[in-house]
Structure formats: C-alpha cells, structure tokens
Amino acid sequence: MSKVYDWFEERLEIQAIADDITSKYVPPHVNIFYCLGGITLTCFLVQVATGFAMTFYYRPTVTDAFASVQYIMTEANFGWLIRSVHRWSASMMVLMMILHVFRVYLTGGFKKPRELTWVTGVVLAVLTASFGVTGYSLPWDQIGYWAVKIVTGVPDAIPVIGSPLVELLRGSASVGQSTLTRFYSLHTFVLPLLTAVFMLMHFPMIRKQGISGPL
C-alpha cells in the first residue's frame, strides 16, 4: 500500500493538500452559529441523495404525478422514509439558510473584502427558495396545483412584460403539463447545477479569506 500511496503522492502531493485542509487556523471567537452554513450544505447533500432516489419512481405528468408519489409512500421499499427525509431536510435547509444569512449579516461578514462571498451567498439563498417553490408543486395535488397557479400568476401584474413572463413560466396560457415539466426540470437539473456552481465559487472564497473577525 505504501508504494501505491507514494505513487500518488509523487504526482498529486496529497500530503500537502491534507496538511492545508487540517491546519487551517480557526479564530477563537468562532462558535456553533458559525456552523450554520455547513449544516445547510449537509442538508443540500441529503436533498440530492434522496431526490435522486425518488426519480426512479416519480413520473412528471399531470395524470401520474400524484399516483407515483402515493406509490413511493406506500409501496416502494423505504419510499416513505426517503420522501420524509427529503421533506424534513428541505425544511431544515431553508431554516438553516435563513439563520446563516442573519448570522453573517449581524457579524459583519458581508463587509470588505468579503463582498463577493456575500453576493454568491445571496444567490444561493434565492436558489434555495426556488427549490422550495418548484418542489412544492411536484406531487401535483390540490395544494401544489394552486400554489403553482398563484406563484406563476404574480408576474402578470408587471406592465408590458407580465403576460409573456407568465406564459414563459407556465409553458402556456394556463397551468398544465408544460408547467409541471418546467418545474420538474428546474427542480431536478437547473437549480442543482446552478447551486453547485455557486457553491464552488462560495467555498473557495471562504477558504481564501477566512472567517470574519468578531464585531
């Protein structure tokens, strides 16, 4: 095993990377409230894992969506547990994200030189809220349907571009299959991809600049 390790070490300098990760200075003022961002990340990873598992059974059609969710909850092995964990983790992710934003704001973590870290964090907060809006509709029950109808109807109040925006969100003039397809694509592909991209921007900046000092 040592020869295998030495082979990788010679090419990748694994030990230097490990030393950099484990020897990062942590300021003495850091407490449990500075862990809220990490908890949010953990919830996101749980969301990815449980959401991926449910894609094997979920059918994004207006005729089968609700029945497929019922199948997950009542017949699929551990489906009830996977979906329940997905829902609980979603609520926890939103809560931790809100608390994290408040903590950063109240401790001045948005100030120079961490402005870009703050901006990417705000974008991640918006993406997190978007996950909630799009995921809420996927069971396509009465609550999900009317929630989508209300949310997608909000832009209609905007002059000139309101109606085109509504049609863009819904895929047609009314809520239907095109709307569900759009929300499913956003929830399972577009939003996770954007979230991963902004996380890859957010975390290296935190790593580079370190944790902000006490007020």
Curated annotation (Swiss-Prot):
Residues involved in heme b 1 binding: 100, 202
Keywords: Chloroplast, Electron transport, Heme, Iron, Membrane, Metal-binding, Photosynthesis, Plastid, Thylakoid, Transmembrane, Transmembrane helix, Transport
Membrane-spanning parts: 32-52, 90-110, 116-136, 186-206
Membrane topology (UniProt): Multi-pass membrane protein
Pfam families: Cytochrome_B (PF00033)
Cofactors required: heme b; heme c
Major localisation: plastid
Cellular localisation: Plastid, Chloroplast thylakoid membrane
GO biological process, one term: photosynthesis
UniProt binding sites for heme b 2: 86, 187
PROSITE patterns listed in its UniProt record: CYTB_NTER
InterPro entries according to UniProt: Cyt_b/b6_N, Cyt_B6_PetB, Cytb/b6-like_sf, Cytochrome_b_N_euk/bac, Di-haem_cyt_TM
One GO cellular component term noted in the UniProt record for this chain: chloroplast thylakoid membrane
Cofactor binding mode and count: Binds 2 heme b groups non-covalently with two histidine residues as axial ligands. Binds one heme group covalently by a single cysteine link with no axial amino acid ligand. This heme was named heme ci.
Gene3D superfamilies named in the record: Cytochrome Bc1 Complex, Chain C (1.20.810.10)
Keyword Membrane: yes
A single GO molecular function term of this UniProt record: electron transporter, transferring electrons within cytochrome b6/f complex of photosystem II activity
Tagged with keyword Iron-sulfur: no
Binding residues for heme c: 35
Additional notes on this entry: Heme 1 (or BH or b566) is high-potential and absorbs at about 566 nm, and heme 2 (or BL or b562) is low-potential and absorbs at about 562 nm.
Entry's family note: Belongs to the cytochrome b family. PetB subfamily.
Subunit structure, as described in the record: The 4 large subunits of the cytochrome b6-f complex are cytochrome b6, subunit IV (17 kDa polypeptide, PetD), cytochrome f and the Rieske protein, while the 4 small subunits are PetG, PetL, PetM and PetN. The complex functions as a dimer.
Role, per record: Component of the cytochrome b6-f complex, which mediates electron transfer between photosystem II (PSII) and photosystem I (PSI), cyclic electron flow around PSI, and state transitions.
Protein name: Cytochrome b6
Protein species of origin: Helianthus annuus
